[in-house]
UniProtKB/Swiss-Prot annotation:
One of its GO terms (cellular component) is cytosol. It is found in: Cytoplasm. It catalyses: dUMP + (6R)-5,10-methylene-5,6,7,8-tetrahydrofolate = 7,8-dihydrofolate + dTMP. Catalyzes the reductive methylation of 2'-deoxyuridine-5'-monophosphate (dUMP) to 2'-deoxythymidine-5'-monophosphate (dTMP) while utilizing 5,10-methylenetetrahydrofolate (mTHF) as the methyl donor and reductant in the reaction, yielding dihydrofolate (DHF) as a by-product. This enzymatic reaction provides an intracellular de novo source of dTMP, an essential precursor for DNA biosynthesis. This is Thymidylate synthase. Homodimer. Its main location: cytoplasm. The gene is thyA. It comes from Sphingopyxis alaskensis (strain DSM 13593 / LMG 18877 / RB2256). PROSITE patterns: THYMIDYLATE_SYNTHASE. It is an enzyme of class 2 (transferase). Pfam families: Thymidylat_synt (PF00303). DUMP binds at residues 28, 172-173, 213-216, 224, 254-256. HAMAP family: Thymidy_synth_bact (MF_00008).
Length: 311
């Protein structure tokens, strides 16, 4: 996209096209959606640019905490909730309510998750979701007699990616994915932003292509694109490269029918400003970044727009 055209206009155009021309269907949640299939957007990361939406406030600190949590390989919501991050609560809460019949509020459930480690261990785990697959993809080793057993330590796709980019930058195999077919049924939610491919330009620029099988354009996308850009910046820094671009491709890109007010408000707004992301410290590895290492500047978004989450 030309530098003179605001990066967010392509997002608003996609939102408008989905709302006007999208195929209306009943979805898994029962809410109903309008969707288009197979859409692509490109976002420059040059000069510290970061694709934060400006037509509504994006709580980028929450997204940052989520990405750092992914990189730990943890799958329990307890460390997130302890930091005030509640974006994953709905799934274990629904499971708890169905299993026990207790009409517990989200606030009380989260308080118990933080206060009681045993309760969190039983009810706060999401299954082998994103981070587990990223850094601990299951491996199997011979157990004799033609049998195999699960190895004690899984395969760290992120560490392998960094090594590959450093030692073989021209490779076309710089890929990691969270889509482990054998584990899908044990996940609270199968990965939406599922496969990442990286590309090193001849001038040392690093680009990331994210394939997202399912995209809630009204709510989830803002976090998805920010985290993809943030991860690209972190990977580039670790590999001595500069961040060039994020290319986003969505499979089923949809708007929920109960997001009409969100769509109307957001399409009435004009994007403005060019936020920047600065990384204050380069740790020895990508797994050692801390929350305080990141600063977003020149971000003056318009007012927050609330909308219900479809579980």
């Amino acid at each position: 996209m030309a530098d003179s055209i605001h990066y967010e206009l392509q997002y608003l155009d996609l939102m408008r096209r989905i709302w006007v021309d999208g195929d209306e269907r009943v979805d898994r949640t029962g809410v109903g959606t309008r969707s288009l299939f197979g859409e692509t957007m490109r976002f420059s990361l040059k000069d510290d640019a970061i694709p934060l939406l400006t037509t509504k406030r994006v709580y980028w600190k929450t997204a940052l905490r989520e990405l750092l949590w992914f990189l730990t390989g943890d799958t329990n919501i307890r460390p997130l909730v302890a930091q005030g991050v509640k974006i994953w609560t709905d799934w274990p809460l629904e499971k708890y309510r169905k299993a026990t019949g207790e009409a517990i509020s989200a606030t009380d459930f989260e308080a118990r998750i933080v206060a009681d480690a045993d309760f969190a261990a039983k009810w706060g785990d999401l299954g082998p979701v994103y981070g587990h697959q990223w850094v601990n993809w299951p491996r199997y080793e011979p157990a004799g007699g033609g049998l195999f057993r699960r190895a004690d330590h899984g395969y760290n796709q992120i560490a392998a990616l960094i090594d590959s980019l450093k030692n073989n930058p021209g490779s076309r195999r710089h890929i990691f994915t969270g889509w482990n077919v054998a584990d899908l049924d044990r996940m609270a939610l199968p990965p939406c932003h599922m496969t990442y491919q990286f590309h090193v330009r001849s001038d040392g620029g690093l680009s990331c292509l994210l394939f997202q099988r399912s995209c809630d354009l009204g709510l989830g996308f803002a976090f998805n694109i920010f985290e993809a850009a943030l991860l690209t910046r972190m990977v580039a820094e670790q590999c001595g490269l500069y961040a060039h671009e994020v290319v986003w491709t969505g499979g089923d890109v949809h708007l929920y029918l109960n997001h009409a007010e969100l769509v109307e408000q957001q399409l009435a707004r004009v994007p403005e400003g060019k936020p920047r992301l600065r990384i204050l410290r380069r740790p020895p590895s990508i797994f050692e970044y801390r929350f305080e290492d990141f600063v977003v500047e020149d971000y003056a978004p318009q007012a927050h727009i609330s909308a219900p989450v479809a579980v």
